[in-house]
Regions:
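Bacterial N-terminal signal peptides that target proteins for export
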Residues: 2-13
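Bacterial N-terminal signal peptides
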Residues: 11-24
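Boundary at the C-terminal end of the N-terminal hydrophobic targeting segment
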Residues: 26-30
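Early extracytoplasmic/domain-onset interaction patches
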Residues: 32-79
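Non-catalytic architectural context of zinc metalloproteases
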Residues: 39, 52, 61-66, 81, ...
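Juxtacatalytic substrate-recognition/specificity segment
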Residues: 217-340, 346
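Post-HExxH zinc-binding segment in Zn-dependent metallohydrolases
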Residues: 288-291, 295, 320-321, 332-383
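C-terminal recognition in membrane/secretory proteostasis and scaffolding
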Residues: 351, 361-624
Length: 624
């Protein structure tokens, strides 16, 4: 401990010497001052992000308050994108502030994510450096190749000006880099990025507009009188641009048609296709940021179609049809919500239906997808005691490897999607096919989103279902949303001539299962007792870095399950003892699974109900 203290003391001396000699600008960075170009109307808060040190993963942020009324409190969000407290302030260093004449004013670090700038009523510029090297749509990254900015991980904000207009501008951008963001800044070609200042209505809107700067591919298409931008940061050989555009044309048309609503003129799909681990998407009101593993993409375009359909529907469900429990956004603490089963789970329900409607899934593919979700739910013992509402409330635990085990928790994505399927079928049963989930979303869009209102979590969804059907849904929500009653699948599927039947499946396993950690890497979630994995020291929490010499992604379990019994897999594993190579022989396991199959005799009425259901249509030809 003495050695560590000596190092800290040395760093303190260096920092003090730096402050004494500081002239207000580091080498290669543009100085932000209180001088304004003639005729420019300053905003209450003005952000500048210098990329001069991009190769070091450092962004230099300047915040100008042209008319500060006195001391300024600044906060850094502790969470964003994921329902996880991630303490982004840990990446900040060298916070200081200067007045109009260039003199320093004291900055006091009052809390872990809070600073107080003790400035008089004057123009003030606050500066700091922030380390950005978190990959994926839930991160922010800056390096010699590109920059991806999830602004809530980058920008301090003042509670006193958070609701006011603010501007954002890049500085010191490499000359070959372009810009495209989701909404606020738009796009800029090489050499013009620094002139592309964007203005947001408030901080919430600004951080809902992720930005990509670097060398990337950009193409666009028109559909339903809207412009869709596709921005791809990847090797040109890692994806098929024509196929990607065709998929997105189909999805966007299907969903806009299904909702009979298009609350935007322009929408941006911002993709990263990394060679390493990568999976997931982050929704925005006017776009989405999505990561899909490049090797997986080359084999099959459906992963990108699936996540794109899900994220695109979020522009309605959660971004506009929004639960009251998520408003106003509290960037400084946990937000307790029981609505994620609807906001995430039913987004998956609709996303999969839209793949059918778009002609990307056939009936069998869709039914197999639903059956796999049922199987996943039923195989998690925790479904017997954790409700789908509570799984959303407990989302903040998902960074804990034990919490993600089947014995401890279910997924609000998984059960939410299954409950969404059953809710759709129940609405159809009660109305003889004349109403459906489509009508429920139309009602919520009309009565909440378009009126600028937030729905009261599960009670709001129940009210919508009861209003469009004229029937009570109290028992459904009590038993299957708030409660843990076993889902009587065939009471619902019989309406469309189907039954959920149990079967036995065989698959190869290395003796452990994984789940994705916050960084998107596969992390060991369970280890079988007396398995070869256990004998080789694999423990819960270990990270799987490589599978057979290639970077591992979130689909390790699926990739291994497709291999033959007796095959060997070579793993690169990282744990408490460091990184090591492990070779395991696969064994075969059997488990129960569900399939959706026809009832013994499907009558024409059931067939008609099914055809409308998997298209997402009402049987009267559409929503009335």
């Amino acid at each position: 401990m003495r050695h560590l203290r000596d190092q800290s003391f040395f760093r303190l001396l260096v920092a003090l010497a730096f402050v004494g000699a500081y002239t207000g600008v580091a080498s290669g960075r543009t100085q932000v001052t209180c001088s304004f170009p003639a005729g420019q109307q300053p905003q209450p808060t003005e952000y500048f992000a210098s990329l001069a040190d991009n190769a070091s993963h450092l962004a230099h942020v300047s915040i100008r308050f042209p008319q500060a009324s006195g001391p300024i409190t600044l906060n850094m969000p502790v969470w964003n994108a994921l329902y996880q407290v991630r303490d982004f302030a840990a990446n900040i260093e060298n916070v200081h502030a200067l007045l109009e004449a260039g003199q320093f004013v004291p900055v006091i670090h009052t809390k872990t994510s809070e600073w107080l700038v003790t400035a008089p009523a004057s123009c003030v510029v606050v500066e700091y450096d922030i380390h950005l090297n978190a990959e994926g749509p839930f991160g922010a990254q800056l390096n010699a190749e590109h920059g991806f900015f999830n602004w809530a991980m980058v920008l301090l904000y003042s509670p006193s000006t958070r609701a006011q207009k603010m501007s954002i501008q890049f500085l010191d951008v490499p000359p070959t880099w372009s810009l495209h963001d989701v909404h606020v800044m738009g796009e800029a070609s090489p050499g013009k990025v620094e002139q592309a200042a964007g203005i947001a209505a408030n901080y919430d809107q600004l951080v809902d507009s992720s930005a990509e700067v670097g060398v990337f591919q950009h193409f666009e298409f028109q559909e339903d009188d809207a412009t869709y931008h596709i921005v791809v940061h990847a090797g040109p050989g890692d994806y098929d641009a024509a196929k990607l555009e065709d998929i997105l044309r189909r999805i966007t048309h299907a969903e806009v048609d299904w909702m009979a609503d298009r609350p935007f003129d322009s929408y941006t799909f911002l993709y990263h296709f990394p060679r390493g681990h990568g999976a997931g998407g982050m929704e925005h009101a006017y776009g989405t940021a999505i990561d899909v593993n490049a090797q997986r993409l080359n084999r099959n375009m459906m992963p990108v179609a699936s996540v794109s359909a899900h994220e695109f529907f979020h522009l309605w469900n959660v971004k506009r049809i929004r639960p009251q429990s998520l408003e106003p956004i509290d960037y400084q603490g946990i937000m307790n919500t029981r609505a994620l089963w609807f906001s995430e789970g039913l987004t998956s329900t609709v996303g999969d239906l839209m793949l059918v409607r778009a002609g990307l899934y056939g009936e069998r593919q869709y039914l197999d997808r639903v059956a796999s979700e049922i199987s996943e739910l039923q195989l998690r013992p925790a479904h017997r005691w954790q409700s789908v509402e509570d799984s959303g409330l407990d989302a903040w635990y998902e960074g804990n490897a034990f919490y993600r085990t089947p014995e401890r928790s279910i997924s609000y994505y998984n059960k939410g999607e299954v409950v969404g399927v059953l809710l759709d079928l129940r609405i159809r049963q009660l109305t003889h096919g004349r109403k459906s989930l489509r009508d429920l979303f139309h009602w919520m869009n009309d009565n909440y989103a378009k009126k600028g209102l937030f729905f009261p979590d599960s009670d709001g969804v129940q009210q919508a279902a009861e209003t469009i059907t004229g029937s009570s849904f109290a028992e459904f929500f009590r038993n299957y949303v708030a409660g843990v009653r076993e889902l009587p699948y065939n009471d619902f599927f019989s309406f469309v001539g189907l039954q959920a039947a149990e079967t036995t499946v065989r698959y190869a396993t290395p003796g452990f299962t994984t789940s994705a950690n916050l960084g998107g890497q596969p992390e060991v979630a369970t280890v079988e007792a007396n398995s070869e994995a256990q004998r080789n020291g694999i423990v819960v929490g270990d990270r799987i870095l490589q599978l057979n010499g290639k970077p591992a992604n979130q689909n390790v379990d699926y990739e291994v399950s497709r291999m033959r019994e007796g095959a060997s897999v070579k793993l690169r594993v990282a744990g408490r003892s460091g990184e090591r190579n492990v070779r395991l022989k696969l064994v075969t396991r059997e488990e129960q699974a569900f399939v959706l199959q026809n009832v013994p005799q499907v009558i024409p009425e059931q067939r008609a109900h099914r055809d409308a259901w998997i298209r997402g249509d009402d049987e009267n030809g559409g929503v009335q």
